[in-house]
């Protein structure tokens, strides 16, 4: 038997590259989570899940590791502190967390509490987010930046909060907003902190490139900035402008795109300072990417730079422009939400079943006993018996042609159902035999490089793709997916992952592999009476809030975990996933009304003796239990 080590598993899933030193594999072959990069302490994910199931917390389970979240905040602030020192930058850096990236109260609360030591702020983009931000700022003097479109009520809320002591900066996204702000400032007499968002010609790259450039949704063009300055000077409000903001998109994969935007943004800042605008902060927005596939490249699911390089370039480029222009360097703000929260949550769920052919009838005896096989079946049998590495290419092509021929003959009535089943069975055996030969050939013939897709099985996992990893479906985002156990054993199956929704789109067919994106995931054969769990990693950004309720599969169970040197871990919070009645409530159904309607109808049937009292009671008991139960599948 071929020797297999945990290092081999780490390699095929590329774990050491996307894991940011936060994930590893222990000697038992289980995935572990570390509280911070290079920490010796860890939590065994498989052992943790087993403990949670003993506590009656069923999969799918969203695991939120709060120490990882704190570690990411600390890392971002540390690299900027180092960059400031190395470049002798004369101003400060400040992190603002954009609530939209993950609005869960416990997440924002953890960021706000831990971030106090770094004077972390919150960025909001709507009235509900503003209210959430104010709730965390209360008693904490937490600074808030307000982006997004604003109506009168939004602006009045900011002005009123400013008046009673909240530290809020109101960013002007459009000129018509400024007119409204000036009107309300005159009406209330409140002097707000104002920011101006500029529309750079520089663009990002990838799915969110349209956040920058001349056609961007938000921001003022150069002519509009001049108009805004004139309007503010006219109303004696130019002194209120404290911040300049730009944003060229999320997940910027190329560092040169960031450098270009920094140069343009810093130059605009310098010119506005020369015009007498007393800007104190330059908010460079988001864009700091996450290396989802570990390739350290400029493809959509990766980045070609490190967090250290990002921070150094930000500080260097801004300082260089300011010194060249002879203006004071600004305090720098970044809104790096994705890089802050992506790593801290892991979804773990169980595999329910597979479409493996192991349960198919064994036609070996039938083939041996059959006096006469259908010609197509006989040809497939002959290929299986004679195939070797020298006839590999030809036999593979013949097999593909013959299986199509079998389907056509069956449809025309020339093959029986049993004939077609034997043809499919032989096709599977031929493909597996080809694979056993191909594995020993270097290099693999070009025509055979994609044939492994014929071997790909479907593993059905207990989750909703649309609820838990919607970006995988919506924008083909790659997320690392790894079995959390048996990684000291060689995987013997290549698979896709299908969810339990009634939608053919609910399947993942692109994965993080050793050499980048791959069309299959190496997994292990399912053992009888042994649970097999897979983990979805780096899903902390956007996935929870973007998830929808396809087939009414609701929120999953969520558990907040902190590390403990003595006990390994402590469960801080358990948030129960949606029960069936809660999912139904989202679409205007009411559990009591459903029960009453069914009960009334059953009583009529009992009275007419169509069913017994016992049958009625049993059904109502099942219905009540289902309404109160988890929307996902049990045993």
From Swiss-Prot:
Recorded catalytic activity of this chain's protein: L-arginine + H(+) = agmatine + CO2
A Pfam family this chain is assigned to: Orn_Arg_deC_N
Gene Ontology molecular functions: arginine decarboxylase activity; metal ion binding
For the ligand (substrate), the binding residues are 282-292
Task: Please verify whether the record's keywords include Transcription.
Answer: no
InterPro entries, A to Z: Ala_racemase/Decarboxylase_C (IPR009006), Arg_decarb_HB (IPR040634), Arg_decarbox_C (IPR041128), Arg_decrbxlase (IPR002985), De-COase2_CS (IPR022657), De-COase2_N (IPR022644), De-COase2_pyr-phos_BS (IPR022653), Orn/DAP/Arg_de-COase (IPR000183)
Keywords of this entry: Decarboxylase, Lyase, Magnesium, Metal-binding, Polyamine biosynthesis, Pyridoxal phosphate, Spermidine biosynthesis
Residue numbers bearing the N6-(pyridoxal phosphate)lysine modification = 100
**Any one GO biological process:** putrescine biosynthetic process from arginine
What are the names of the required cofactors? Mg(2+); pyridoxal 5'-phosphate
**Which pathway does this chain act in?**
Amine and polyamine biosynthesis; agmatine biosynthesis; agmatine from L-arginine: step 1/1
Q: Give its E.C. classification number.
A: 4.1.1.19
Q: Which family does it belong to?
A: Belongs to the Orn/Lys/Arg decarboxylase class-II family. SpeA subfamily.
Q: Function of this protein? A: Catalyzes the biosynthesis of agmatine from arginine.
**PANTHER family per record:** ARGININE DECARBOXYLASE, BIOSYNTHETIC ARGININE DECARBOXYLASE
What is the name of the protein in this document? Biosynthetic arginine decarboxylase
Q: Organism source for this protein? A: Geotalea uraniireducens (strain Rf4)
Native organism taxonomy: Bacteria, Pseudomonadati, Thermodesulfobacteriota, Desulfuromonadia, Geobacterales
